[in-house]
Design a protein with these regions (language model features):
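Structured beta-strand-rich core segments of catalytic domains in phosphoester-bond hydrolases
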Residues: 1-12
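A solvent-exposed, charged loop/short amphipathic helix patch at secondary-structure junctions
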Residues: 10-37
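A long, amphipathic alpha-helix that forms part
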Residues: 30-59
């Protein structure tokens, strides 16, 4: 089963570092961002519930690829640290204590640690551009363990930077209309043992 994911970025009133730093005297923007995070978490919890039902039959039967744009909401890192809110990707992959339902990333750890699919100005870093990986391909145990009929081709999960770069108008690449998408695509090869 292919499960296309596009969590909503759920824009909030929290837009600037000044708002974050002023949260004690003017909490409304941060409270709004917390509500946004709760909505994202609820969206992911529901998706996780559905995926668990599908893959709980065991690795030989539950073949699921969950892929797409996993927006993690405004100020995700500081919200997680300040309020002990979980990362939505961590929520979605499940628990290693339930190995028949635990998803893994299709990308090799070495590549995953430096990969990015989007670039944006981060208000927490003075408006500097930062790069992040928010587009992911997650595999159910039936695929990543090799116990089922579908298998991940080793080292096949990549960010398609070359294809994306080939279609960017370099002169004004920061403008959205001069890029093929706001995110670089990610690809993977899944082989069938049929």
């Amino acid at each position: 089963m292919l499960c296309g994911v596009h969590t909503k970025s759920k824009f909030s009133q929290l837009k600037s570092l000044a708002q974050w730093n002023g949260r004690d005297s003017k909490p409304a923007p941060v409270l709004d961002a917390l509500t946004t995070r709760q909505k994202l978490s609820a969206e992911v919890a529901r998706l996780r519930s559905v995926l668990t039902q599908i893959v709980a039959t065991g690795p030989a039967f539950g073949h699921v690829v969950a892929l797409g744009d996993f927006n993690d909401g405004p100020f995700a890192d500081v919200m997680e640290a300040e309020f002990l809110i979980g990362n939505i990707l961590d929520e979605l992959v499940g628990s290693f204590l339930e190995p028949n339902t635990y998803f893994k990333h299709a990308m090799e750890p070495e590549r995953l640690s430096s990969a990015s699919t989007t670039r944006f100005r981060d208000p927490l870093k003075g408006g500097q551009f930062v790069e992040e990986l928010i587009d992911h391909i997650l595999l159910s145990p039936g695929i990543w363990s090799g116990a089922g009929r579908f298998r991940l081709r080793p080292n096949s999960c990549v960010v398609e930077s070359v294809a994306w770069d080939a279609n960017v108008e370099i002169a004004q690449s920061e403008k959205r209309q001069n890029r093929p998408s706001d995110h670089k695509p990610v690809s993977v090869v899944i082989e069938w043992d049929g």
